[in-house]
């Protein structure tokens, strides 16, 4: 462990937390017949609809190929509709998709929040949020080191 910097230890913690919380969220969302990725996609569609597949892919953590397969499945389940407007195909929620999201949303948000509410007070959560926002913004501009 002596070779690890505090930065690399933080990075490892974040990866482990993300993996564990995603696994738990996937298990939790089974009661709503959704995965974490589907929940995120439905939430992003509701927030920004109508939007294109490319716009959606920029907002979620699913690959372009993965988003295409997921949208096909969500469309078959009646949760979304894709409309062709001249050259652009847009995605929107159906009433059924809105209802599915409304069933899951309050409980999933409470579950997600519990990861932090159970161990951090409000001030600690604000500080963590500010620090994570700062790191995230930096990561968006980060470039790979030169070889």
From Swiss-Prot:
The keyword Transcription regulation applies. It comes from the Bacteria. Residues 1-137 form the HTH marR-type domain. Induction: Up-regulated following infection of host macrophages. GO terms for molecular function: DNA binding; DNA-binding transcription factor activity. Keywords: DNA-binding, Transcription, Transcription regulation. Residues 53-76 bind DNA. Deletion results in virulence attenuation. This is Uncharacterized HTH-type transcriptional regulator BA_1941/GBAA_1941/BAS1801. It comes from Bacillus anthracis.
